Amino acid sequence: CMRIRRVERKVENRMANWVSAGCGVIANELAQAMEKRGQKLYGVVNRTPEKAVAFAEKYGVQKVFTSFQDVCADPAVDIIYISTPHNTHIHFLRKALAAGKHVLCEKSITLNSEELEEAVQLAKEHGVVLAEAMTIYHMPIYKELKKRMDAGKFGELRVIQMNFGSYKEYDMKNRFF
C-alpha cells in the first residue's frame, strides 16, 4: 500500500499550473471538471499534435507542448496529469519526477511493483507528490464501508472481494462500448 504524503510547494498567489499528458476521454473529463471549478489546464501534450491543438482549443488551454521533455523543462509547470496508455506511465513518471514536477497519474499507475517502487523513490528524492487517480476512496459508500469495518461491524475480516460499477451514458466513441 502506497502512502502519499502531503508536500507543500510555494506557488506565489496563483493557481497551480496543470499539464495533461494525453488528451483522450479521461483527460477530457479532467478538463471539464476543472472548468466547473472555474479553472483551466495550463498545457497539454499528446503524441498526435493535431489532437493536442484541438483539445487546447476546446478547453481554452494556454499552451500546447510538442514534447514531454518540453513540459518537464517549463518552470511554470507545477503538476503533470498522466492519462496515457498504462505501458507508457513509467516512462513519463521518470521524466516528470526527476524534473521536480508533482504528478497525478491515472490507474494503474505502473505495470508492476518494481516500477512503482522506482517512481515512489524518485518522488521522495525530488520532494514532490506522486498520486494515483483513485476516485473510489472518496465515494460515500467506501467511506461508510471503511467506517463500519473499523468499528468491527463485520467481525474479523480475512478476505474481501468487491466489485464496482458505475453508470455511463451510452457513447459509441468510448472504447468501453
Task: Say what each PLM segment does.
Residues V11-Y59:
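N-terminal Rossmann-like dinucleotide-binding module
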Residues S20, F65, C105, L130-E132, ...:
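Hydrophobic residues in well-ordered beta-strands that form the structural core
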Residues L30, Q62-V120:
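Beta-loop-alpha module in the N-terminal Rossmann-like domain of NAD(P)-dependent dehydrogenases
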Residues F55-V61, L122-E125:
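Short, conserved SAM-binding/catalytic segment
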Residues E118-T135, G155-V159:
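Rossmann-fold dehydrogenase core element
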Residues I136-F177:
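Predominantly a Rossmann-like dinucleotide-binding segment in NAD(P)-dependent oxidoreductases
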